[in-house]
Amino acid sequence: TFVHHKPDIERIDRLLEYFKKQEQPEQKTDAWYKFRYNGLTASTIYKAIDSQANINSIIYEKCQPVKIRSNSVNITSAFHNGHKYEPLSVLWYENEYNTNVGEFGCIKHKNYKWLRASPDGINIKKDNPRYGRLLEIKNPTTRVISGIPKKDYWIQMQIQMEVWDLDECDFLETVFKDYENEEAFNNDGETYTRTAMGLRKGIIIQFY
């Protein structure tokens, strides 16, 4: 990520105040799933302009009753992996760029009410050159990070910027790898914070 120009602070202030007053269900709640179901969202709209199979898929999805994800935990799913590590990705981003990332829900486009988007966060630190920039996070489980977003991710970010009326979006991909046991953790590097290859490491505690 890099900075092209200084952010228009007054414009971003107005937009964020406007968005705070709009209906935006909190992410992963029942209301959020229903809100997304009743429109086309940034994360799925690529199907509408992709292969016939994907076009059929999105039509089929909209013909089915709304699906609310259960509270049960499947620790092997890609969804769980992304949800588990997303807060760590945000913390890394905030630390790396000395910023603060605010959480926002899913909103409707001002004019096209069926078009909806929910970024993983927005830079809200006014004195940061990335103020007002959207953040989209992916934590792949098997795919190798190449530095180039997949087509569906690229479309997702374009729609997010359109719906939120913000001109920039940082795409962050992170991979967190688990050690098999405590011994493997201790043997990888000479400290508790860096691996033998100089990468960051640490302990993640998860509560259910």
Q: Model regions: which residues?
A:
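Charged, glycine-rich intrinsically disordered N-terminal tails and low-complexity linkers that flank
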Residues: 1-84, 88, 180, 191-194, ...
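Nucleic-acid nuclease catalytic cores
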Residues: 95-119, 123-208
